């Protein structure tokens, strides 16, 4: 059981017995269930569960994680587009034109698990931007964070197309350390 995970936050991996499990999500501090589904998990595997969209239109993405360490002297990043109503984007390294991920659309990883694969990067200060695909128009800029050697990160573009700026629901590109 995982509790107290607020909007935009993450928890560590939790163990589960292999086989069929029930995944239930309640509104924080209540017994009101907003998601309830059965899924199957395999022995000795890791899975990520992402919840997104609004409370009453909740979407959940569950996928198996590749826990292979990054290549020697590198860090790993992958990208999830969970920006409700957002355009297709490219993820571009700051200070250059290197595209790490191209033409990524809302929830595209759901039908294509290859889109949850990691890309190796040099460790150290890491910054990038989500830009409308094929343009330089910035949707969101990720402030620099320290990508550590041997660690893996998921870059999540989240938020709502019509959210008020500076609110938690406004579009934001955030790093999640995959523990």
Question: Residue spans of the language-model regions?
Answer:
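Intrinsically disordered, low-complexity polar regions and short flexible loop motifs
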Residues: 1-179
